[in-house]
Amino acid sequence: MQADKSEQRAVTRLCIQCALYLLQHGAESALVEELSTRLGRALGMDSVESAISSNAIVLTTIKDGECLTSTRKNSDRGINMHVVTEVQHIVIMAEHKLLDYKDVEKRFSQIKPLRYPRWLLVLMVGLSCACFCKLNNGGWDGAVVTFFASTVAMYIRQLLTHRSMHPQINFCITAFVATTISGLMLRLPAFSETPTIAMAASVLLLVPGFPLINAVADMFKGHINTGLARWAIASLLTLATCIGVVMAMTMWGLRGWA
């Protein structure tokens, strides 16, 4: 009996760790609930119930009429689909009886978020913003302006993130830098005829697309509270970006977007 309780306690910890990994790294709430439940049942539980909010998870496992509940506080670790994929693989292996709870615990301890080199991330963000500008009739000169502005802005954003700057302040400063660089470059004689779409494209790196998509997905699938919380966070980030853009345009007297 004591051994069964000890095993249930271990499985409960693994289930809530599974849910926490997913929620911390950007998975939608329905996936968090589904995978934690599947893992618990794969490891011998009769039922797994969970309540998910934006800053905490409460999870209960039931086996032979015995309930065990655990609570964990959630902290955002940034979007990382590598972690989500790794957790999915572990759950699938447990369902196929390739892993017991001790193996799952070992696999969880080995999960490390995939991090790309900073220089590569800066380069790819600059190129993606420049391509958007070119596709929206910004021309090659507009793409050059966008590339330089968004590259520097992404570098600044990484520096501020590394120093644990508040996300809203981070986005505001980054938007200010991107708009300042692109706007002042458009004043140069070489770019005097460049469309101002370059200014808009240079702040695309700050669009919180993933949180907004997850917010809508959560609300459609019944996780209203989590969806609204994610929507509010994404809206605040968007507001901070707008403030940074307006500050730069007002300070330097830049012409508006067209």
Swiss-Prot record:
It is found in: Cell inner membrane. YjjPB constitutes a split-type ThrE family transporter. The transporter is composed of YjjB and YjjP. The chain crosses the membrane at residues 116-137, 143-160, 171-191, 197-217, 231-251. GO terms for molecular function: transmembrane transporter activity. This is Probable succinate transporter subunit YjjP. Involved in succinate export with YjjB. Both proteins are required for export. Participates in succinate export, but also in the export of other dicarboxylates, such as fumarate and malate. Contributes to succinate production under both aerobic and anaerobic conditions, and increases fumarate and malate production during anaerobic succinate production. Its main location: membrane. Belongs to the ThrE exporter (TC 2.A.79) family. The keyword Acetylation does not apply.
